[in-house]
Amino acid sequence: MKVCIIGASGFVGGELLRILLQHSGVEVVCATSRRFKGEYVYRVHPNLRGFTQLKFVEPSIDAALKADVVFLALPHGESVKWVPKLYESGVAVFDLSADFRLKDPNAYVEWYKWPQPHPYPDLLQKAVYGQPELHRSELVGAKLVAVPGCMATASILMLAPLAKHGLLGETPPVIDAKIGSSGAGAEGSVVDLHSFRTYVVRPYEPVHHRHIAEIEQELSLLAGKRVKVAFTPHAVDMVRGIFATGHVFVEKMPTEADMWKMYRSMYGDSKFIRIVKDRLGISRYPNVKYVLGSNFVDIGFELDQRLNRLVTFSAIDNLVRGAAGQAVQAFNVAMGFPEDEGLRYIPLAPV
């Protein structure tokens, strides 16, 4: 199956290349970049030296149409210019931007500051939210997939079993997320320079972060009612990784056995979700160190009987499970490949 990556010079584009170059069912036929047009891919992504002789080409519809599948690793607001033409042509599209994640066209005005509602509401409804654990049946054969956001992924998956079992009540769950510097992309702002980022722990967009929209959308679907969340992310001194902590206040506390049953019933057959709650060993709860470079989501929980509070944890690699890895996982499900094809990475340790 021939694949083209539009926007292949950034961190996410590089991860797509790393994964797809080792996928047994894929031939990467084009990787685009305006800035690096004509340059060897490995000169921008040195870790790929020896694995490919591809050169970057100018992004164009014509280049994309040489492939069966197109991965769009473009900034928010850019994919919407590409998707209609690609979709009409019959090419399968996996969009890693936010441009087709939200079902409500008006949500793009509120959360992404678009000047008007989404111009393609029909395509919004056709797009499948690309989280295989929650939308597996819809993904099979899908031609337009909206790959979830990184912090949304960590947040949704740790709270999904609680939403499904009616434990998200009137009090909004509180989500505290930490993310590494690669989340800012390959061309971040001045505060992402080493001298500013080293040793940092700082909040950003502490209220009304745009990932709230998809977190609430997905949890509401599972709960069968409107769910709101309080979400605050923090930039921290690491390159890769997201760690999220969720606080859910309930009227009636489940037992620990109930919690295990809820999480196992939803994720027991998942190839990429590991429940980490151990009384022994050096990692008794999820830890970003033990998912780096992989597509795993490590999820844990604890019960606070004093406050009727459920504490949930999740750890992911933001570039893999939070972006490129999840895109390939969704691609595998959509196209009939083994779900873990190209994604069989044991996380590095120590790092």
Curated annotation (Swiss-Prot):
| GO biological process, alphabetically ordered | arginine biosynthetic process via ornithine; L-arginine biosynthetic process; lysine biosynthetic process via aminoadipic acid
- List the cysteine pairs that form cystine: none
Keywords assigned by UniProt, alphabetized: Amino-acid biosynthesis, Arginine biosynthesis, Cytoplasm, Lysine biosynthesis, NADP, Oxidoreductase
Q: Which residues form the active site?
A: 150
Q: What is its EC number?
A: 1.2.1.103, 1.2.1.106
Report one GO cellular component.
cytoplasm
A Pfam match: Semialdhyde_dhC_1
Q: Where does NADP(+) bind?
A: 9-12, 33-35, 318
Annotated InterPro entries: AGPR_type-1 (IPR000706), LysY (IPR037535), NAD(P)-bd_dom_sf (IPR036291), NAGSA_dehydrogenase (IPR050085), Semialdehyde_DH_NAD-bd (IPR000534)
Pathway entry: Amino-acid biosynthesis; L-lysine biosynthesis via AAA pathway; L-lysine from L-alpha-aminoadipate (Thermus route): step 3/5; Amino-acid biosynthesis; L-arginine biosynthesis
Catalytic activity, as annotated: [amino-group carrier protein]-C-terminal-N-(1-carboxy-5-oxopentan-1-yl)-L-glutamine + phosphate + NADP(+) = [amino-group carrier protein]-C-terminal-N-(1-carboxy-5-phosphooxy-5-oxopentan-1-yl)-L-glutamine + NADPH + H(+); [amino-group carrier protein]-C-terminal-gamma-(L-glutamyl-5-semialdehyde)-L-glutamate + phosphate + NADP(+) = [amino-group carrier protein]-C-terminal-gamma-(5-phospho-L-glutamyl)-L-glutamate + NADPH + H(+)
GO MF entry, a single one: N-acetyl-gamma-glutamyl-phosphate reductase activity
Subcellular locations according to the entry: Cytoplasm
Q: What function does this protein fulfil? A: Involved in both the arginine and lysine biosynthetic pathways.
UniProt record similarity statement = Belongs to the NAGSA dehydrogenase family. Type 1 subfamily. LysY sub-subfamily.
| Protein name, entry field | Putative [LysW]-L-2-aminoadipate/[LysW]-L-glutamate phosphate reductase
Task: Identify the species of origin.
Answer: Pyrobaculum aerophilum (strain ATCC 51768 / DSM 7523 / JCM 9630 / CIP 104966 / NBRC 100827 / IM2)
